[in-house]
């Protein structure tokens, strides 16, 4: 049995989203200076659930595993003034749409059986922090994964 956290993270990082860099779990920068960028959150894996599909010893029993992968979009550095806010919200909304379109259009998903935006796929839209705590306009994305193991 092997869960595919690294494989699906690689698959998501390889998505093509116009004007956005997507980082893998081993590529998270210490700052958000190369924006727009999508990075895994520190609580990258949440809502882990395991359902046994058959009985038997753990190494051979069929199981369905579901979990949520959490990412943060850093769009532009937060600044003062109304024009910065309007520019940020327009551009941020566009990048959110492009990323979700790319996820929904994945014909081949390496590592999992299914990958879809969560029910609450977008949270914290507005001011978010980069890894170094600098403030950016951005949001968090949540993607639900489903794997069959063994």
Locations of regions flagged by a protein language model:
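Charged, amphipathic alpha-helical segments and their flanking helix caps
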Residues: 1-32, 44-150
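A short glycine-rich, His/Asp/Glu-containing loop-to-beta-strand
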Residues: 36-40
């Amino acid at each position: 049995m092997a869960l595919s956290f690294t494989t699906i993270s690689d698959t998501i990082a390889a998505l093509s989203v116009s004007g956005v860099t997507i980082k893998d779990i081993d590529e998270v920068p210490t700052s958000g200076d190369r924006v727009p960028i999508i990075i895994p959150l520190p609580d990258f894996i949440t809502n882990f659930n395991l359902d046994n599909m058959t009985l038997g010893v753990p190494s051979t029993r069929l199981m369905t595993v579901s979990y949520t992968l959490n990412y943060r979009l850093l769009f532009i550095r937060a600044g003062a003034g109304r024009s910065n806010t309007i520019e940020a919200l327009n551009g941020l909304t566009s990048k959110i749409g492009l990323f979700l379109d790319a996820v929904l259009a994945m014909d081949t998903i390496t590592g999992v059986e299914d990958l879809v935006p969560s029910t609450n796929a977008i949270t914290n839209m507005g001011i978010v922090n980069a890894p170094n705590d600098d403030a950016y306009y951005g949001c968090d994305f949540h993607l639900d994964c489903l794997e069959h193991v063994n």
